């Protein structure tokens, strides 16, 4: 039985103009997974350039930003490409009771440790950085980039997606992902601005609402497998096309004909 991560796109109503625009852009988007042991990858330079623009990190001769969490077994980094050009990047950690290395655990262990002990599993996104010109040309770039984190919550069966955010950015996470505050404001090592921890619990009702409003977050099992389960071979870093439109169209067909599960695999 075929399934997509569109938990019922409950109605076959047309998408909003905003969602339609992002579906069109995603037809031109590819995602690449990065080998964590190769520090000359362009995404590390993109990080450096983005942080230097805000003077969030000191100057270094290498012109890259890397840290110990780039090489943990539960970490993975991705580049976002539009028309073949690298425009943004993001790092994810799959945080479990057995694998407790992640940025959020560095700053908020008192919040997360009891939850991990209870069996909760988290996707912990970090290092979201973008090319300056691309951020002006594509104001919705955060949506295109954070889509990778949404796919990861589905692929790994996480119970919550975390977000270490600046206080002034919390409204975005509350509005888009229905995230809730989990901590006070704290300092993150190496960054010049304060952060707080937010989390979006992964529930069928909440996913249903998010996918209905933002269908471009949807994906197929095939796309998720290519990003998160690919073997470390010579194709590992090859950019992969997105499947938002295909997943959305499948969900509409399944909702139209009824009786077919559209829950995530």
For the regions a protein language model found, what residue spans apply to each?
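Short acidic N-proximal helix/loop "leader" segments that mark the beginning
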Residues: 1-26, 245-265
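Short amphipathic alpha-helix that is part of the acyltransferase structural core
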Residues: 18-67, 77-81, 86
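Beta-rich nucleic-acid/ligand-interaction surfaces
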Residues: 62-71, 168-171
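A short helix-loop-beta-strand connector motif used in the catalytic cores of GNAT acetyltransferases and
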Residues: 69-78, 100
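Short glycine-/small-residue motifs
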Residues: 89
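Acyl-donor binding region in acyl/amide transferases
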Residues: 95, 102-204
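Charge-rich, low-complexity intrinsically disordered segments
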Residues: 192-261
């Amino acid at each position: 039985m075929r399934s997509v991560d569109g938990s019922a796109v409950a109605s076959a109503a047309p998408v909003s103009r905003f969602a339609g625009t992002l579906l069109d852009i995603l037809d031109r988007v590819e995602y690449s997974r990065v080998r964590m042991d190769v520090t000359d990858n362009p995404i590390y330079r993109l990080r450096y350039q983005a942080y230097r623009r805000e003077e969030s990190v000191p100057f270094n001769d290498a012109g890259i930003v890397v840290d110990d969490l780039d090489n943990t077994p539960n970490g993975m980094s991705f580049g976002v490409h539009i028309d073949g050009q690298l425009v943004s990047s993001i790092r994810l950690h799959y945080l479990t009771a057995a694998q407790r290395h992640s940025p959020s655990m560095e700053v908020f262990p008192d919040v997360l440790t009891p939850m991990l002990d209870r069996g909760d599993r988290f996707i912990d996104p970090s290092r979201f950085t973008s090319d300056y010109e691309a951020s002006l040309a594509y104001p919705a770039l955060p949506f295109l980039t954070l889509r990778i984190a949404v796919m990861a919550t589905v692929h790994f069966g996480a119970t919550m997606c975390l977000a270490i955010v600046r206080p002034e950015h919390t409204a975005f996470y509350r509005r888009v992902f229905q995230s809730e505050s989990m901590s006070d404001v704290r300092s993150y090592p190496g960054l010049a601005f304060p952060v707080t921890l937010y989390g979006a619990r992964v529930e069928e009702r909440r996913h249903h609402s998010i996918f209905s409003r933002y269908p471009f977050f949807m994906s197929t099992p095939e796309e998720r497998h290519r990003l998160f389960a690919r073997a470390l071979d010579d194709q590992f870093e090859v950019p992969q096309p997105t499947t938002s439109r295909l997943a959305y169209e499948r969900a509409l067909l399944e909702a139209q004909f009824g009786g077919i599960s559209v829950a995530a695999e």
